[in-house]
Amino acid sequence: MTWHLLPQNSAYTFVNFISSENKVNKLAQVEISITNSETTLEKLPSDNPQSGFEDRESGNAPSWILTRRPGWQSDENGLATKSKSALASTIYSHSILNPKLYEIRVLELQPDLCDSSPIRVLLSKAFISDPPKYQALSYLWGDSSEKVPIFVDGKRFNIGKNLFAALKCLRLRDSSLLLWADAVCIDQENVSERNFQVRLMKQVYSSAEQVIIWLGESEDDSDLAMDLITTWAPPNAEETNMPELLETVISKPNVFDLRSWHAVRRLFAREYWFRAWVLQEIVFSNRAMVRCGTKQVAWRDLGVVQLKWEQLKSEPENFHLLTPKQLKMVTLTFFSAVSSITLQHLARRQPNIVPRSLFRLLRAINASQATNPRDKIYTLLGFEEVSVLNIKPDYTKPVERVYAEFVQAYLESECKLNILL
């Protein structure tokens, strides 16, 4: 079972993976060479003021002097720029976290003075035991090579395009907004800080006033999809029986518009739903809101819609309430990610109805994706079923060791071999 959490979904691949020492060692060496780099080459013009510029008529290239300067590197254009680690250390130097005090950082998103104003945030520290009122972002990091600059405490700082879009969409016109977003609030270049902050993820999301589930910008008729979900979740929908709910829904125009239902399927095929961290971020939230572009719907309503659709599909006596075409639209809608999260949500709040199970947790996380394979283990550490295994996140450990230690702890705790299936 756990083998499938690794790349290529194969127990055979896992055996080869952990036996291939050179692969892991080389990866580790690359990480060390990058993160521990103190000096890099920089190109500077020579003392001749004219030599730093190309003679446009002759086409002669300028002369350069190679020099070393700590914390600087050359970009793709040959220009001297501060390295990522140097920029990060500058940003976080005034807000170093004390793990003994269980501190986190929160960001204050500054108001939008005009539509074209750059995004500016202020960082501050807080105790997770007594946090301010903040909202936690749950989002997809996306392509790490696509970066967009913002200003953190007045200093330029690069973030992913998807997080940038979220901040731009959430930014208020006349007041600031207190948020938590891992890419900014955790020094990603500081491994020891990451190790400790990952242990606090459950508290970060459970202490938030609200978790904002950011699906991305509006595209592929996502506005239609969000509107359709809202239509299926009228007030008291949870207590409404199926005939009454369908009567309410069908009375509204364009509810079974084919274009809208295709849009719903695309919405739930977005990469966000396959993130390994989604389960923990939503399950432990006290209140969650799904945002896609400018549209939003409460997570609770989304869960109600999913349960109602499942009920409609599982009770043949309801089939006559819809035409064959309408029923097909409901039954073909992809909702497995929401279903898994809803099930774990119930297990936290009503364990007498849905018993907690470590094996069920592993199955829920099995099909998820993570840029760092270690995260498919570490994302489970907030769950009681896993916390008893006493596993601590450590991003310096080789991937195969992280998985081997987890399997050993599972076997010792559960005394079952089903994890090997």
Regions found by a protein language model. Name each.
Residues 2-19, 28-30, 64, 82, ...:
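Residue(s) in the substrate-gating loop at a strand-loop-helix junction
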Residues 7-8, 21, 73, 205:
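Long tandem-repeat architecture
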Residues 14, 75, 84-136, 140-143, ...:
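Metal-ion-coordinating, acidic/His-rich active-site neighborhoods
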Residues 20-26, 33-81:
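Long, intrinsically disordered, low-complexity tracts enriched in Ser/Thr with interspersed Pro
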Residues 28-32, 37, 45, 62, ...:
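Non-catalytic, regulatory and substrate/membrane-recognition segments associated with hydrolase enzymes
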Residues 152-161, 390-420:
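Short secondary-structure subsegments characteristic of cysteine-rich extracellular domains
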Residues 155-181:
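Active-site palm subdomain of RNA-directed nucleic acid polymerases
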Residues 176-187, 205:
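Active-site beta-strand/loop microenvironment that shapes enzyme catalytic pockets
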